[in-house]
A protein has these predicted regions:
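Pyridoxal 5′-phosphate
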Residues: 1-145
Length: 145
């Protein structure tokens, strides 16, 4: 019985805070996107305009950098991201979703998915941008030809 009551309270709070949470997520997502495109060259937004997609997910390809390699470089700095699309996160191989939206193979292989939560902060977003700039520039020096 306590679990049901707790779920009811959690549901009520989620409903009451829904619009505020969506607004916060969208603000953080825009900050992340704007920071990435202003600090790093040759990036590609995978999906709709940043304001039209889900407020908590940003999928970007970094030309000349394999997504899996960048994922591990970011992990070393305490930043956890995913490769591919949210719809294919448990499947091996290239994302069928990124293929379906018409991305070329090189963009699919360089895709990183950022998932933002309501407890993330602007400082964490800024840290992520700073680390991304450092790691992407470093990895591009060693890209396969």
């Amino acid at each position: 019985m306590p679990g049901i009551v707790g779920f009811g309270v959690a549901s009520k709070l989620a409903k009451e805070n829904f619009h505020g949470n969506v607004s916060k997520l969208m603000t953080l997502k825009k900050r992340l996107y704007q920071g990435i495109v202003s600090e790093i060259k040759d990036v590609h937004l995978n999906g709709p305009n940043v304001e039209e997609g889900a407020p908590h997910i940003l999928n970007i390809s970094f030309a000349g950098v394999r997504g899996e390699v960048l994922l591990h470089a970011l992990e070393e700095k305490g930043i956890y991201v995913s490769t591919g699309s949210a719809c294919s996160s448990k499947k091996k191989g290239q994302s069928h979703v990124l293929k379906a939206i018409g991305l070329k193979e090189d963009l699919i292989e360089s895709a990183i998915r950022f998932s933002i939560g309501i407890f993330n902060t602007e400082e964490e977003i800024d840290y992520t941008i700073s680390v991304l700039k450092e790691k992407v520039n470093f990895l591009r020096k060693y890209k396969r030809r």
